[in-house]
Amino acid sequence: MNTFGHFLRVTTWGESHGRAVGCVIDGFPAGLEVDEEFIQREMERRRPGKKYTTQRKEVDRVEILSGVFEGLTTATPISMVVWNVDADSSAYESLKTVFRPGHADYTYWAKFGVRDWRGGGRASARETAARVAAGAMAKLLLRRYDVKVMGYAKEIAGVSCEVDDAEKAFERAERSPLRMPDERAEKEAEQRLKEAMSEGDSVGGVVEVVAKNVPAGLGEPVFGKLDAYLAYAVMGIPAVKGVEIGAGFEAARKRGSENNDPIVLKDGRIRFATNNAGGILGGISNGEDIVLRAAIKPTPSISKKQRTVDYEKMEEAEISVKGRHDPCIVPRAVPVVEAMVALVLADCMLMQGLIPRSLL
Amino acid sequence: MNTFGHFLRVTTWGESHGRAVGCVIDGFPAGLEVDEEFIQREMERRRPGKKYTTQRKEVDRVEILSGVFEGLTTATPISMVVWNVDADSSAYESLKTVFRPGHADYTYWAKFGVRDWRGGGRASARETAARVAAGAMAKLLLRRYDVKVMGYAKEIAGVSCEVDDAEKAFERAERSPLRMPDERAEKEAEQRLKEAMSEGDSVGGVVEVVAKNVPAGLGEPVFGKLDAYLAYAVMGIPAVKGVEIGAGFEAARKRGSENNDPIVLKDGRIRFATNNAGGILGGISNGEDIVLRAAIKPTPSISKKQRTVDYEKMEEAEISVKGRHDPCIVPRAVPVVEAMVALVLADCMLMQGLIPRSLL
Amino acid sequence: MNTFGHFLRVTTWGESHGRAVGCVIDGFPAGLEVDEEFIQREMERRRPGKKYTTQRKEVDRVEILSGVFEGLTTATPISMVVWNVDADSSAYESLKTVFRPGHADYTYWAKFGVRDWRGGGRASARETAARVAAGAMAKLLLRRYDVKVMGYAKEIAGVSCEVDDAEKAFERAERSPLRMPDERAEKEAEQRLKEAMSEGDSVGGVVEVVAKNVPAGLGEPVFGKLDAYLAYAVMGIPAVKGVEIGAGFEAARKRGSENNDPIVLKDGRIRFATNNAGGILGGISNGEDIVLRAAIKPTPSISKKQRTVDYEKMEEAEISVKGRHDPCIVPRAVPVVEAMVALVLADCMLMQGLIPRSLL
Amino acid sequence: MNTFGHFLRVTTWGESHGRAVGCVIDGFPAGLEVDEEFIQREMERRRPGKKYTTQRKEVDRVEILSGVFEGLTTATPISMVVWNVDADSSAYESLKTVFRPGHADYTYWAKFGVRDWRGGGRASARETAARVAAGAMAKLLLRRYDVKVMGYAKEIAGVSCEVDDAEKAFERAERSPLRMPDERAEKEAEQRLKEAMSEGDSVGGVVEVVAKNVPAGLGEPVFGKLDAYLAYAVMGIPAVKGVEIGAGFEAARKRGSENNDPIVLKDGRIRFATNNAGGILGGISNGEDIVLRAAIKPTPSISKKQRTVDYEKMEEAEISVKGRHDPCIVPRAVPVVEAMVALVLADCMLMQGLIPRSLL
């Protein structure tokens, strides 16, 4: 279950404080030129060590060990490694026998009877570095078909952004430390974030991802629907607690006549006048933008005191999680959600035969 | 992609106006006594022909064709059939060449170049009868392990119910035509629904499902997380546009200190003082109730006039969808969401070894 | 595990003496005209009730319950049912508590703790009726791409046929009660079969299947190789104990210089001068005929006395299996092996993009 | 399709002359002590650079990058890397545009339009180093349940060994340069091999693997039968052209009364008096030894002149494959077949619940 995808399959491996994290991409078509700089730029977007993020210093350089020959993919598995450089387990020594609230410490222990307590081990968000590397490959592939996947923080600490145009929002957000597309909202969110930080607390938010130029016909009813697949992909990202498509939960409050997107002809092609459906009808893409939002919970690692249990002594205890943590994971979650969406879309295009097995 | 599940796999088949719908359940353990009455009661909960639902008359009797011998499951595939009795395609004749807005008509046509236009064909919610039949088998299995899956309409037409206790809410909702647990909310929702109906319109809502006595340890990180699997299962139900777990989108507005569930000892066992996590941490169940909500869009079939395209003439057209439709699909969606949750939980318990291959 | 295939997936269900056997085909492309007569002819080739076969009378009429609309496939699941008409469990009553040697009686009991003792239940070769029905659909699809799958009994009771041309061999074999392409061998095999029958015994043989006009490029290294996939498909047929490709076990006795097929140009196309490889190199089809042989063990049901164990009394016992059994299953196994080969080839062509999702 | 297994899944990656080969093992239970020395000994058994093998010098040291913490497996993915040290592509430069007969050169090119021509790239038997590493982990797991997987060369160059006792045969073979258990046969085979070598030619043979103490109940009918799964696993090994179980192709020549294994009581337990079935009935293990044979073709790389095609000039050509090649791959294939058998058995034991998710 560390493998994602049907036709294009990504297997990730590695722990937060182990030697490395990495992935193997299988089913990638032959003949794509690998733009390593692009991959590195994607890694950079998720990388820690910036404002409002953990101060762990990781260069996150991706090494490709297989599957590429003379600059081209060969349709054989692409093995990518990101070495862990700045893992520091000392802060975790004292947490060895207590479960951090809001983390997977207890559940891993309950499931497997053993856990790597250093920095969350496998459950650490560090694993998502491998997803971003794989997602970068998917984006390179989609780029060739003019499909763009763009994300930003739609909301942080309860402050929501107005977004008219996803492309502009994306560009604006890329220059924002909170990855928010709306300056006014950003200011307010920043204020709330600082307040939380000053109290040793954290905040959450909502990531929105829009995919443009997605062809109609993607998705496999009745269980492998495009929206079901996206929900699976995105809900499996650490800290995500909700996923919605198009109008999402708001659709539940609308009338049918409001929510149904009128079908029209534009330039002789069948299109939709509105996009409450978020680009998906009956689990199949309809040619409009795919619009998806993910609810990101506040970072569970906080220095504020919390109640927990010490399982060696089997007694209640107090905990204050030190170490280097993101007070808000939302900005760094954006490229991860994008990566998963890109992987889903590339996989569906391959399944639908819209991307061939070989580009040559 | 008409198969759902890993260890416990359900394949559904059939079209709304074809001869039957049905399913094959594979991987079901040997030795379970099959309570056919229970299965039939579950079918009855989803069955059309009642107040505020389509008036199509279907007895929805399940026939078991294989996999059961002398009343016990044998671990071989269980084939179940529900014959279509009251399909009436006449209302659809006039819609043959126009796409119904909010339906899968356009996308099936775009994907496959052909579609069964009678009542939505495969994309019809009639397919969910097969899911409920399979889900009933999963519930029978879970019942043996004291796991209960209970759902109700949390919200209809924007009117939300107060719920303290899921078990009582479930019981109350079972006696409600809107399957709402809160009488006051029900009255108001009923009023809004009637208004919509009088205008040839429809409404949506939110289904909440709670699973009790779920053991800790279910779910397969990092991609096959329990919440990801549930999101996949539930987002794939027709009309669902959003899924959230525990505090869900509200979690995005909380502080870490509010959202983290304190870990405590109750009767010497590790438990959680609150349940914002909805019973899942790091993608693995933590022993608390699983709490999930699904946003259900308003029924797309409305008699109100809508804009669409006639694809034979390739020109814009108006459409008014006649036929027998649910003005609000939420009450009938409840057992479907429950069925998918039950299938996920049974599958995870099998994968985790908590349910053996043979109960004998 | 009652599902076969990756892209084109077949799920079979049903027991020998249950109500029916059937299958659900998922992933079948849209737009194929369904030739029901062809399907029925394929069923006829496997049907019991002929010379040298069990005298069980089954018309084996296939009913299609879904996935076909106005004569065309719609890319939705195709559900097919074959009702059991002439099941007679009385002969099995006395065998309820003894394991038949050479059968799956003991292993099903050991695995599941319960078994349907009537006619072998799920382990009966009757299940292969569903495979032949599904295989017929695959053949219809392949026919459109001029791919032909032809089988015959290469050997029965140790008597082997000379085969020069697979197409002629197939045609000759279709008129032979033993499905043997070589008259001289057939006479001798018939003699040996009659001898065995007169002693209440049975014989085995070898089925050879040749697939013509298979495009190069099918198969997925390194684990999903075409030969591995074929071996999986064919070894899973009841009574098969060995599978070989091309020169097979004989290749193990050759020199490299003899076994390597020289690569040549024929009419400007790259071809192979010989076909020891059986059309597969490195797990990928090379454009030559696929040649596969399966070893079929002698029918385990024999009236000759055998030693066994009565597991109720837990003591040794003697058994003489009465009932209506094939003294040699090889002729009826031929269409089953063909069906599995056809399913594999159709699946691989879909995966490789050589057959599109929609033929329209 | 570079992933093998259902519950225990192995993904291999890497090319012969790339930077490394490796694998990721997913689904491995928690709590197993990792005996790195054992893994290394297994690598040593497959390692090149010995008598009658290629003279490529590879230390084949396995590095474990994840999934192990404080010496114990953690149920998270185990990433293993074997760096390529002595790859020398110079001998392949001249073969860039010609297909080597008997190799996958043509088929990879036909399938993907591009190929890594250095040493066979992904199709090289070097990939099996990763399989042996993964297989070693499976063996460690099986060892805990007393299941032993032992292989040897049953036949080389047409010379067959007598084997009475698999355990003794295995031990004897481990000391033999040809990995043959029978000294007389070994001498003769060695003679024939030398003759072939002197003519720039190669020979093939048959590997036999026996698994002892395999519990009854493994295998998933009707498609995922244990024998089908083994056939899939073993036929997918480079150079394998045939697989048989128990009596295999010989069973096809026997009478039912000879081939059926009598069922008897030994020490109060149900057992089989003979083992023509090779430990598998109806696709499920019966508690007897699993016996499997694989036909290995002669090494296709020979210095003897062969006919081929130069695809740049698109004209016929002659080829003499220089470089460092095994004149007979059989001895080195033995641990690879064992590895695949071990992976299958461990996977089936996990699926059957005979190995738990955590050993703690």
From Swiss-Prot, chains A, B, C, D:
InterPro entries: Chorismate_synth, Chorismate_synth_AroC_sf, Chorismate_synthase_CS. One of its GO terms (cellular component) is cytosol. Pathway: Metabolic intermediate biosynthesis; chorismate biosynthesis; chorismate from D-erythrose 4-phosphate and phosphoenolpyruvate: step 7/7. The keyword Disulfide bond does not apply. Pfam families: Chorismate_synt. GO terms for biological process: amino acid biosynthetic process; aromatic amino acid family biosynthetic process; chorismate biosynthetic process. Its cofactor is FMNH2. Reduced FMN (FMNH(2)). Its EC number is 4.2.3.5. This reaction introduces a second double bond into the aromatic ring system. Belongs to the chorismate synthase family. This is Chorismate synthase. The gene is aroC.
